[in-house]
């Protein structure tokens, strides 16, 4: 009954809860150590079930067994599939932004052991579908965890990339797609892997894949393939050349051809694929590289321009990004390539459309229904089309000017609306800005085109040209400046202000004629300064910065014959704006992130100017300010005519005073010749100073190099010092230990020597006993001989017993006596034998003691040999240290040579400086003579003033101009002299620095020499101690060997044998 009750309780009791960590550890142990395949498979399935919830436990306990199963169970696809899937579960992380620690650890376990990567590479080419798929996905997971490490690891295998490329040609789509994703991530930012992939026929594989998928209509797979192609071509010149040489450009252009599309519907997948193909073509022809010229020519020869033009002007793509990227791709194709540019202009596309190039571009550029970014892509293409092609730029500019001058009503007449003051802001707010950018692209860096644009007639009725010949015409620059001033107060047209300023900066840069044209109306300059001074909250930093740049160029390129002189421009700027404020405007423009300033942000910004600028286009007393400006120009003309009449009246007085002027001219010519000579000398001195500066720069570099070498030497010496000190300490400790061992050995040797003495005394006693034994043995032998003779005689007498009885009796009596004597002898012999046995036991004891002494001597010899080895090692260390000290000495000598060379150069510089100072003194003397001559000229001018009152003003002007020229020349000479003085002072400071550096180097050298001498002395003392120790050891060994030989000789004399091994040791 008890049995049934217990079994009933067992059935009804709840089951025990099994812990996960125990189960996982058991399963992992079974997977790792089980011999049966079914056990390992069951364990792998159990581990897989726990892997999702307990990643850390499974990775900690079972990763070794999982990786072992990958190697061991390669032939079984089911178990291999389970293990690969388990690895995938462990490496994948829930958060896509950051890899988990478990995934990183597993990735490290695979990467650190190359056999694991090799196993994965083999499993990629497995027969089973899931094994191939999971292997590729596992590679992708490892790449997401450790990208750089996996790339470096794969490059160590020669056939890794070829193995990875095999699934890309697989007929099963999941495997192929997974491998495509993995490869596209693998080749990013790794040029070497990109080259290896291309050498495995990646281009042919990709194009065949695209063809099978239906080109740009292939969906996501085609998009990924095109992205992969773009990555292979971008920033990789060797792949670009291989792509061109293998004739793949027609295949890429075929993908972009509209005729190959399935239908006319443009869904998002097709648009994305076309855009990615255009990006790939852009990567093939990058801007700014000389290697892209061949690729540009190849695209042109394969009718790529017509294909791209068709996409860029396709009516269905007007509101897609495809059109914008097509114009940018065309810009890549024609940039700085005359052949491509001419082929674009001569394209049959424009003949079919019955239009010219510029009109077609302007149709899209000024189309307000499309976005500004689309329109700017056309402007960017126009810039690339005219880059480094002056002929085409001049042709386009002439077409625009011809349309304006002939008042043509077409797209080319963009200047008319651009300069019209009635419409200060265009309707879509971008036309004037685009016009400014186009004109800037066409005239930049070419003075002829700038003159052509600035010389067009403005604000004139073409029918009344003859009536207006006597009036001054308003120039192009003045009109653009006026339009800019009038536009500043319109908040919705500030992007046009940026365009106007950009064009003005391009016209003024490097062109004094344009600056003269701008300064012909001084009121415009004042209005610009008022805009620059604006400190209100609505002021725009970009516009103020560009105005500051423009005024800087105006001042820099201001010519001598300008209506407003250069000094007046400077005074006007400095009086209106402080220097710090002006620099602040420039710095604010420089700090602006211009890429973030979009058209919309420019539209929302506001700017205000003062009352004069606000009232510029208002009417005052029924008169327009522009008409008042024209009347002011007429008055200026009348004043110029009056000046001409006064000049004719003054010609007579000029002739009378021509003689005096000739004299003055001669004196001025002489002064000019002297100044020219001084300038030539100054140029020579300047060249010499430049050479000296270059030499000083070289010396500074050498000084820096020597300082760095000195620092390295100091560090090395410090390391050597520390090493020597530690080694010396160790040597002293070892020496003390050896001395202690020597003392112990000496004590032991004294004990052994005393024992040897006792042995010698006992051996002498044994010798005497042996001698007595030998004498007794000789006597015994003699007695035995006598006995033998007697026995012979007895035998003879026995034969004659009968006859000699008497003799027998006597013989018997003698025999008894002899027997008595023999008994006594036998007792003596037994006693002697006992004594010999005692002596032999003593000899054995002595021999055992000798063997012990031999063992002690051998241990001492071993210690001596070890000490000798240590001494030899210390000698080798000392030799190495001596070699290092020699090298340090050599480095110090080299540094000393460099310092001597620097001192020589410093001396040469001082000599040149002294010569320059002498030349400066001579130049100051000549300057003083010139000042005296100027004083004489002034006195002559004063005398001429009293001659005539009518001609006084003219003479004053002439003399003042000459005086100004001479004074300017003197000022320039003084400036040059001051500059030379400053350079001389700099040279002196550099020489002082060189001298200080040489002193520092000398002190460092002295300290190094001291340390070297100290180390050498210490080494010598150590060598002496080592020699003394060697001699002492040799003496001890010789004494031990001599005593050992004596002991052996004593043993031989005692009659004991010496082994052959001992004799060989003696030899």
Swiss-Prot record:
Compartmental location:
Cytoplasm, Cytoskeleton; Cytoplasmic vesicle membrane; Endoplasmic reticulum membrane; Golgi apparatus membrane
Location (main, coarse): cytoplasm
Bilayer topology term: Peripheral membrane protein
Against InterPro entries, the record matches this protein to: ARM-like, ARM-type_fold, Vesicle_P115, Vesicle_Uso1_P115_head
ARM repeat extents: 51-92, 105-144, 148-188, 191-234, 237-285, 287-313, 343-366, 367-405, 407-446, 484-513, 514-555, 648-688, 770-810, 830-873, 958-997
List compositional bias (Basic and acidic residues) regions by residue number: 934-943, 951-962
The protein's UniProt keywords, in alphabetical order, are: Coiled coil, Cytoplasm, Cytoplasmic vesicle, Cytoskeleton, Endoplasmic reticulum, Golgi apparatus, Membrane, Protein transport, Repeat, Transport
GO BP field: endoplasmic reticulum to Golgi vesicle-mediated transport; Golgi vesicle docking; intracellular protein transport; membrane fusion; vesicle fusion with Golgi apparatus
Where is coiled-coil annotated?
623-1034
Q: Where is this region: Disordered?
A: 934-962
Q: Which cellular component terms (GO) are annotated to the entry?
A: cytoskeleton; endoplasmic reticulum; endoplasmic reticulum membrane; ER to Golgi transport vesicle membrane; Golgi membrane; Golgi stack
Pfam (any one): Uso1_p115_head
Looking at the record's lineage, which domain of life comes first?
Answer: Eukaryota
What does the UniProt function comment say about this protein? Answer: Required for protein transport from the ER to the Golgi complex.
Against PANTHER family, the record matches this protein to: GENERAL VESICULAR TRANSPORT FACTOR P115
> What is this protein identified as?
Intracellular protein transport protein uso1
This protein's species is Schizosaccharomyces pombe (strain 972 / ATCC 24843) (Fission yeast)
- List the top taxonomic levels of the source: Eukaryota, Fungi, Dikarya, Ascomycota, Taphrinomycotina
């Amino acid at each position: 009954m008890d049995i049934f009750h217990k079994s009933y309780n067992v059935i009804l009791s709840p089951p025990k809860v099994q812990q996960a960590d125990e189960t996982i550890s058991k399963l992992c142990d079974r997977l790792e150590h089980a011999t049966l395949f079914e056990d390992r498979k069951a364990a792998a399935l159990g581990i897989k079930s726990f892997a999702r919830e307990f990643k850390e436990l499974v990775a900690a306990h079972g990763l070794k067994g999982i990786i072992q199963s990958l190697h061991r169970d390669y032939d079984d696809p089911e178990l291999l599939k389970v293990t690969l899937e388990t690895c995938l579960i462990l490496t994948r992380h829930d958060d896509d932004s950051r890899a988990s620690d478990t995934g990183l650890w597993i990735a490290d376990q695979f990467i650190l052991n190359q056999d694991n990567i090799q196993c994965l590479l083999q499993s990629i080419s497995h027969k089973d579908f899931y094994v191939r798929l999971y292997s590729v996905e596992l590679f992708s997971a490892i790449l997401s965890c450790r990208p750089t490490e996996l790339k470096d690891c794969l490059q160590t295998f020669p056939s890794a990339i070829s193995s990875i490329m095999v699934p890309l040609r697989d007929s099963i789509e999941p495997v192929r797609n997974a491998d495509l994703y993995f490869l596209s991530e693998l080749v990013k930012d790794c040029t070497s892997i990109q080259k290896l992939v291309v050498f495995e026929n990646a281009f042919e594989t990709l194009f065949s894949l695209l063809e099978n998928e239906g080109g740009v209509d292939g969906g996501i797979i085609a998009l990924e393939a095109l992205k992969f192609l773009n990555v292979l071509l971008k920033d990789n010149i060797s792949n670009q050349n291989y792509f061109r040489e293998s004739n793949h450009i027609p295949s890429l252009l075929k993908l972009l051809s509209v005729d190959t599309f399935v239908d006319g519907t443009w869904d998002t997948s097709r648009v994305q694929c076309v855009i990615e193909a255009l990006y790939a073509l852009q990567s093939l022809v990058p801007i700014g590289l000389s290697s892209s010229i061949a690729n540009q020519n190849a695209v042109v020869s394969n009718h790529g321009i017509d294909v791209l033009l068709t996409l860029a002007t396709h009516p269905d793509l007007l509101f897609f990004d495809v059109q914008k990227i097509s114009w940018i791709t065309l810009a890549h194709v024609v940039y700085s390539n005359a052949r491509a540019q001419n082929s674009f202009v001569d394209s049959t596309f424009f003949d079919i459309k019955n239009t010219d190039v510029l009109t077609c571009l302007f149709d899209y550029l000024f189309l307000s229904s499309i976005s500004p970014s689309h329109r700017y892509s056309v402007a960017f293409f126009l810039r690339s089309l005219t880059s480094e092609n002056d002929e085409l730029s001049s042709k386009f500019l002439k077409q625009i000017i011809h349309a304006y001058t002939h008042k043509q009503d077409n797209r080319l007449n963009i200047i008319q609306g651009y300069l019209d003051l009635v419409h200060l802001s265009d309707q879509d707010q971008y036309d004037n800005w685009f016009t400014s950018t186009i004109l800037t692209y066409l005239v930049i860096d070419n003075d002829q085109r700038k003159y052509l644009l600035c010389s067009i007639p403005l604000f004139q009725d073409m029918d009344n040209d003859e009536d207006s010949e006597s009036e001054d015409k308003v120039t192009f620059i003045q009109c653009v400046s006026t339009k800019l001033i009038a536009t500043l107060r319109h908040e919705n047209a500030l992007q046009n202000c940026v365009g106007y300023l950009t064009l003005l900066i391009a016209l003024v840069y490097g062109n004094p004629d344009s600056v003269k044209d701008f300064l012909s109306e001084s009121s415009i300059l004042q209005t610009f300064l008022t805009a620059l001074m604006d400190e209100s909250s609505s002021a725009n930093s970009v516009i103020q910065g560009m105005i500051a740049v423009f005024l800087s160029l105006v001042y820099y390129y201001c010519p001598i014959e300008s209506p407003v002189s250069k000094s007046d421009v400077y005074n006007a700027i400095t009086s209106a704006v402080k220097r710090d404020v002006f620099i602040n405007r420039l710095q604010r423009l420089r700090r602006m992130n211009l890429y973030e300033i979009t058209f919309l942000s420019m539209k929302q910004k506001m700017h205000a100017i003062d009352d004069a600028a606000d009232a510029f286009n208002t009417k005052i007393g029924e008169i327009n300010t522009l008409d008042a400006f024209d009347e002011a120009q007429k008055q200026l003309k009348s004043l110029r005519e009056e000046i001409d009449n006064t000049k004719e009246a003054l010609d007579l007085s000029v002739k009378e005073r021509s003689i005096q002027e000739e004299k003055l001219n001669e004196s001025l010519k002489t002064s000019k010749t002297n100044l020219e000579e001084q300038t030539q000398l100054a140029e020579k001195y300047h060249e010499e100073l430049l050479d000296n500066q270059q030499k000083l720069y070289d010396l500074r570099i050498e000084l820096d190099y020597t300082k760095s070498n000195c620092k390295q030497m100091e560090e090395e010496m410090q390391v050597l010092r520390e090493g020597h000190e530690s080694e010396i300490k160790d040597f002293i400790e070892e020496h003390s230990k050896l001395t202690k061992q020597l003392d112990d050995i000496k004590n032991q040797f004294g004990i052994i020597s005393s024992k040897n003495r006792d042995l010698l005394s006992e051996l002498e006693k044994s010798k005497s006993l042996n001698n007595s034994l030998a004498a007794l043995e000789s006597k015994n032998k003699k007695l035995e001989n006598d006995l033998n003779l007697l026995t012979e005689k007895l035998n003879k007498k026995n034969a004659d017993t009968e006859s000699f009885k008497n003799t027998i009796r006597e013989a018997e009596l003698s025999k008894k006596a002899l027997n008595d004597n023999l008994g006594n002898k036998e007792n003596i012999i037994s006693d002697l034998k006992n004594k010999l046995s005692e002596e032999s036991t003593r000899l054995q004891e002595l021999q055992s003691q000798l063997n012990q002494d031999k063992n002690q001597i051998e241990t001492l010899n071993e210690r001596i040999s070890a000490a000798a080895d240590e001494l030899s090692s210390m000698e080798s260390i000392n030799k190495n240290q001596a070699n290092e000290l020699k090298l340090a000495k050599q480095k110090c000598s080299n540094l000393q040579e460099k310092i001597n060379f620097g001192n020589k150069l410093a001396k040469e510089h001082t000599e040149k400086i002294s010569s320059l100072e002498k030349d400066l003194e001579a130049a100051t003397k000549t300057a003083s003579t010139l000042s005296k001559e100027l004083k004489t000229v002034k006195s002559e001018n004063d005398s001429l003033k009293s001659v005539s009152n009518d001609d006084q003003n003219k003479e004053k002007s002439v003399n003042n101009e000459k005086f100004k020229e001479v004074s300017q020349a003197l000022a320039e000479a003084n400036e040059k002299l001051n500059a030379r003085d400053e350079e001389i002072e700099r040279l002196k400071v550099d020489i002082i620095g060189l001298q200080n550096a040489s002193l520092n180097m000398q002190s460092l050298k002295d300290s190094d020499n001291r340390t070297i001498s100290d180390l050498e002395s210490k080494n010598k003392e150590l060598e002496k101690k080592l020699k003394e120790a060697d001699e002492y050891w040799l003496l001890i060994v010789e004494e031990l060997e001599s005593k050992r030989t004596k002991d052996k000789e004593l043993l031989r004399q005692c009659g004991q044998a010496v082994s052959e091994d001992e004799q060989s040791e003696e030899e």
